[in-house]
Amino acid sequence: MLDFNWGIHLIDLMKSTFNIGGDLPVFRLGYGAMRLCGQPGNFGPYPEWEAGKRLLLKAVELGVNFIDTAHPYGPGYNEEIIADALAPYTGGVVVATKGGVEKTAQDRVFADGKPESLRRFCDASLKRLRLQQIDLYQLHKPDPEVPFAESVGALSQLRDAGKIRHVGLSNVGLEQIREAEGIVPVCSVQNRYNFEERGDDPVVDYCEANGIAYLPWGPLAAKPFAPGAPLADNSDASRLAAVGRRIGATAGQVALAWLLARSPSIIVIPGTTCPKHLEENIKAASLKLSSEDLAELNVVG
């Protein structure tokens, strides 16, 4: 069993927020907008544009005030549909986006962390999102061809220029986080982490200890815990299903509730294009996992 402090499960998570950068309070169950693009490959505009706008409005109506997107989603169209639906972002809605990855075709995606590229990406995102300042701008992925400090330094300069409020990182390790902190305050980290894949535990713990938001991407591991997906025949799925049966929830809802209980710094950002699944995901924030539930879920293997 993993030795974590799970006391957070006693809190009503619908009322649980995290202050990104100390001054951006967001509900800890957000929305990852990536799927509101053309498919396959998240390339091109979302074909059901008006339905996508309604889904975003529904998310905000249900209490979501943190939306995550990125330049290469579309590319650009994802940011445009968010602005079309939600600008001018009343009621404390926070939109986080990313730069540092370019997409020129469905199967042509590459890191581009050159300072001049990051400035260009940021300016384009500001225009598409109809913003004067981006609340949280994240380096999407370190570019192996560019010194990491140069990429982070470009974000620091954008912050100094007032174009971004807070800086975040994505797809990084502890050493890179510490290196970035020597250049600019790091307010969020977005890495792959979910009930099945817990290899980023040291980063989760570091973020909690240092007041950094942790945004796990792939929170439902794509399968087998996504809403409507058949449960795989494995121990992870069976444990989630067993807890779900006891508390009247789906395996996917339990997986999201587990993440929220894992650390008070975690903000989960599940994505969906289905209104029913959106509601199902958001309801996960009100689940109460007992100490017995968590003990069962935390057995590895």
Question: Across the structure, where does each feature detected by a protein language model lie?
Answer:
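N-terminal binding-site loop/beta-alpha segment at the start of enzyme catalytic domains
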Residues: 2-93
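Acidic (Asp/Glu)-rich catalytic clusters
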Residues: 21, 83-91, 127-130, 181-182, ...
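Conserved beta-strand positions
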Residues: 31, 69, 97, 136-139, ...
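A short acidic, helix-capping loop that chelates divalent metal ions and anchors anionic groups
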Residues: 37-42, 102-108, 223-227, 277-280
